[in-house]
Amino acid sequence: MFESTSFGRVMVLDGVIQSTERDEFSYQEMIVNLPLCALETPAKRVLVVGGGDGGVLRELCRHPSLERVDIAEIDEGVIKASKEFLPHMAKGFSDPRVRVHVGDGLQFVKDAPEGHYDAIIVDSSDPVGPAAVLFERPFYECMHRAIRPGGVVCTQGESIWLHLDIIKEVTSMCRGIFQGGAVSYAYTTIPTYPSGQIGFVLCTKSRDGKPLEPNEPRQPAPPMDLSSGPLRYYTPELHRAAFVLPAFAAKVLAEGTS
């Protein structure tokens, strides 16, 4: 953790910037509201894998429909550091709907009851070290089982400028798992991440044989939160626009799809 003149407090893990006070909201608002606002019915139960800085929890807790939020974070040190140095992000940990589970996210998803969650959000680091399993087939198969029909998964999906091969591999794998559903890539802009862009892979589980396309917002944006203030990035218009990719990326990700 260090203090930056331009970006405020900065959290770094293994030499990689994870969040800064100045621009973290663009990532947090999009990774939460893209999946939750795409649902046909408001979410009641959500699982967060990773997300120990608390930013995802903060944005989730804006949603009044939520009854319970589980978070599985493997590194308790991240939670403690965020509570001490980034309290504006960590405020979600104090919400009574939140249950914190320190441990392996893959194992937590494996142990979840079938169809238990409306949405699963994976706020992971890059696919190296302990986070590598969160980009592999067994994890996505477990998430598919753990969400209800009509539910949605949203994972940190890397950058089209740096990791297009990984994105194609993950989206192709997900289409084989979420058959009858929909798999899409969306992105947000965030200056302090490499290339200034980071994406999300969104997968929906078929209900009655009908795919739920995640690029259409069906739920309203959450109301202003008295402690967090209004949304600063997400809008319904930006929701739709986030799925419109540059030609080179759209071409690569469309290859092999019907």
Regions found by a protein language model. Give the residues of each.
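The AdoMet/dcAdoMet-binding core of the Class I SAM-like
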Residues: S19-V152, W161-I166, R175, S195
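SAM/dcSAM-binding transferase cores
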Residues: S172, P194-S258
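Conserved Class I S-adenosyl-L-methionine
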Residues: Y140-H144, I166-Y187, V201
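Non-catalytic substrate-recognition/targeting regions of SAM-dependent transferases
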Residues: F2-V12
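Short proline/glycine-enriched turn/loop segments at secondary-structure junctions
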Residues: T188-T192
